[in-house]
Amino acid sequence: MKKAFGQTVRDLKRGVNKKVLKVPGIEQKVLDATSNESWGPHGSLLADIAHASRNYHEYQITMGVLWKRLSDSGKNWRHVYKALTVLEYMVGHGSERVIEEVKEHAYQITTLSGFQYIDSSGKDQGSNVRKKAQSLVALVNDKERITEVREKAAANRDKYHNSMHRPSGGYGDKYDYEGRYGDRDEGRSSYGKEREYGYRDDDRNSRDGDRYSRDSEDRYGRDGNTDDEYRGRSRSVDNYNGSRGRSSDRERPIEDDGQSSSRDSGAPADDHSQDGRGGLERKFSEQNIGAAPPSYEEAVSESRSPVYSERDGGETPQVAPPGAAASPLAENISVDNKAADFVNESSPQQVEAFDEFDPRGSVSAACAPTAGASVPAPIPPTVVSTPAPPASINAEMDLLGSLSDVFSPNPLAIVTSDSTSVETNGQANTGLAPSFSTSQSSTQPFDDPFGDSPFKAITSADTETSQHQSFGVPFQPTPPTSNPNNEHNFGFGEAFSAVTDSEPGVQNMQAPPNLSVFPQEQFDTSQSEIDILAGILPPSGPPVSLSPQPDSTMPTSQFHPNGNSYESYHHQAAPTDLNMQGQTPFGQASQQFNMVSHSQNHHEGMQFNNGGFTQQPGYAGPATSQPPQYTPGVSSHPPSESFPHQPGSATSASSQTPYATTPNVSAGQFDGGSFMTQQPYGVTQQVHVVPSHIPQRTQSGPVAAFGNNNNIVGDMHQPGSTPSSSSQTPYPTTPNAPSGQFDGGNFMTQQPYGVIPQVHGVPSHIPQRTQSGPVAAHGNSNNVVGDMFSPAGLSSLETSASQPSLTPLTGAIEIVPQNQKKFEPKSTIWADTLSRGLVNFNISGPKTNPLADIGVDFEAINRKEKRLEKPTITQQQVTSTINMGKAMGSGTGLGRAGAGAMRPPTNSMVGSSMPTGMNVGGYGGMNQHQPIGMNQNHPMGMNQNLSMGMNQNYPMGMNQNYPMGMGMNMNMGGYGQGYPMQPQQGMGMAPPGAPQGMTGAYNPMMGQGGYNPQQQQPYGGGYR
């Protein structure tokens, strides 16, 4: 009686502990089966453990407990013996994976053959362990015996299945190819049905769910109708054919494991597909016969960026957008934009995306065909499998996630063609842009590494036609002939998406010169539905190739075929007009990076060490520039596209040229993808350094604000300059300039004379607008920082580089001196507390001093201590703040309590969350006149191309060639990346908390968000 009572108490105690400690159910069962009780493991526990071995996670828990039990010794010999018993049972009844693991641990089991333990009664209990260990090792080494044992176990299950204990659920056995246990639960009672459903559905999306779920419907399914009711779909949807192609002779119910396997698409049954989709999603899978099955991500996202996988150079199934039918290669394809409207974002098309970590292949989605199909006309989605040339750019996810396609937010309507001619008839209005037709031969969309597409820009020609003005005569550029052999993979997956062909003379794109003024309402229409992260997260779609200027000839884009992302890229053009825009490796006009003025005679050309390119035009003549037009299907948003907005109508044609005509410029040297000019005279510059993917609009007329919500930082610089159009020249007119040098991705002008530089440095992905006329206010709600610099009428950055006065900022953001906040160390707090009497250590003591008679005077001692303490406190207030204070840092090492307690510099700076890589007035990036603690040839600014995964040799921006991973907008750069590397730390160290993978307005000093001048640290030293 006492023994039974003690056993009951132990059981209760064990049960309470397991509940309190939240031990998993399977672990409880294994512990119970291998307990120290004097009886063997219960059959129901063994059955549950064997079934759980088919669940990956439960299998791991089970085996972990068993191997730990096998390591016991001495009086815990029952742990060892029972663990061997459980293993032996699992070899016959559980997953075959157990057999493999037992073989791997055979050495451990073999050592148990010498297990010794003699209990208090003198009985050799170790013999039981020795015999069991020997029998288990012999079993796992005998394949025939294993087969016999497993077949016998299967027969027993079929014979006694009515009395069989309910399994705890789990997945199918990937090793159980013969379907031996398929009939396990055919007539099982209803005990535990609902519980099993809930349990298994919780785990069906687990890590290896698809691997171990092949036979779950054979084992644990009961009734197809019950299954279908639970799944919420009818059996006719799956076209269930009643057999899985294995040894089962009856129809098995549909698994409730998140799978419809490969029955839908006709693929072999052994393809462990995870195709639990319905409706249109399944239709894509059914059409996708020869392709790898889509991933689970498709079941949860309806509109995701499409992606391709051309690793094997095989067939790439493609679904044309609902506004485009995939057709064979055509020589001349005429696309009526008004009819097709490129179906743009307005079509509620479901696009299955592809898991970037799923290695199984491509997904049928609406995306741009590779160099083997063209998409000309609107019909419902059609799957076309076209052999993708192995030489084409792999549209695989690179680590930085489709960098070049960050700014083509139209994932649905992508019109790429490898035909020799494409005519664009009409104009499809897409929210923010005029029509533009181009051929991007080797651009492919990318996957979205952050989940769903950041936005759905829903616009259509019906709603937008009344809001936009035409640019005049639509032009028909002659696209370059596609040559898939010249497509390159640049080191970052497809970081450079707009790759032009290396055939000379194929980009002679000419447009009619009669163009109207850049329409004001072109940017009035705000796409309020566009996410604020639209410029950060990479929606799929190739960036636009910019339209040529009127009467200009596109220079030949010659690309070195080695595919090196840092290879020099030369645009060598015949004498043409100066508005030359060629496709660059960054998917934008070559003018963006050709910061040095077009010269009539480049002596040494422009030298690019790092990912730059050289454009050597022969003659830079005046021309009335045209605002680049781009196709709505190719890209959607000017603020997120890469093209310079150039004024349509100009007072003076020559003054409106974005690149001043330079008679003789010796050399512009690009070292890190940045730009620096050396001007020997007093030239008033307005240098707009436009790194990758920055829309730059220079206009002389009144212009409305960018109306889209991508404009995070707003128009960074809106100087109210003089109305003369000569001030609109974004690049300086330099009669004779020595070589400009770029060191480490910064912009630095060395001006020997009185030059008033007006530098508007903008890192990647920031809209820049320089206007001389009145500027309309931003109409969007996502303009985080607003117009940082005042529009016309306010003194803007035009004089910020030459005078240290504060610049009035829109939104009442002003840089005000911060009061030096006194930091009080702990000793001061204690002294103050004690002096105020807030803490009385003599709470319970007597009022009179009991030791007064022996000469102990506590008051005198206290007074003496306070006198000694006060000088120390005063000294600590001066010197000891190096290691006290702020929560995250050690101060600056300069006797200051941290950056927040210092007065920021008086010259204008752009601020924390405004990632203007080349700030004005020498706060970071440009350091025109105040290169504090920095070499002028090595200004720290932002590596212009760094945000796109380029120029990784200079990630520090200091030209030290040490990629220390300081994350200066390396992570796909986005609006408000802030300064992950604080601008004027002499070391160029990154704050320790700047995550590399974080995009968005991250600032290591103040998190994500707006501008706070207190967070600047003007001194080199410690980082917060």
Swiss-Prot record:
It is found in: Golgi apparatus; Cytoplasmic vesicle, Clathrin-coated vesicle. The keyword Transmembrane does not apply. Residues 152-327, 419-492, 538-565, 602-670, 712-739, 884-910 are annotated as: Disordered. Keywords: Cytoplasmic vesicle, Golgi apparatus, Phosphoprotein, Protein transport, Transport. Residues 18-150 form the ENTH domain. One of its GO terms (cellular component) is clathrin-coated vesicle. The modification Phosphoserine is found at S273, S285. Residues 888-898 have a biased composition (Gly residues). It holds the Pfam family ENTH. Residues 152-161, 173-236, 246-255, 269-285 have a biased composition (Basic and acidic residues). GO terms for biological process: protein transport. A motif (Clathrin binding) lies at residues 403-407. It comes from the Eukaryota. Residues 419-432, 460-470, 551-565, 607-639, 648-667 have a biased composition (Polar residues). PROSITE patterns: ENTH (PS50942). Residues 434-448, 719-731 have a biased composition (Low complexity). InterPro entries: ENTH, ENTH_VHS. A motif (ALPHA-ADR binding) lies at residues 448-450. Interacts with clathrin. Belongs to the epsin family. Binds to membranes enriched in phosphatidylinositol 4,5-bisphosphate (PtdIns(4,5)P2). May have a role in transport via clathrin-coated vesicles from the trans-Golgi network to endosomes. Stimulates clathrin assembly. This is Clathrin interactor EPSIN 3. The lineage of its organism: Eukaryota, Viridiplantae, Streptophyta, Embryophyta, Tracheophyta. The gene is EPSIN3.
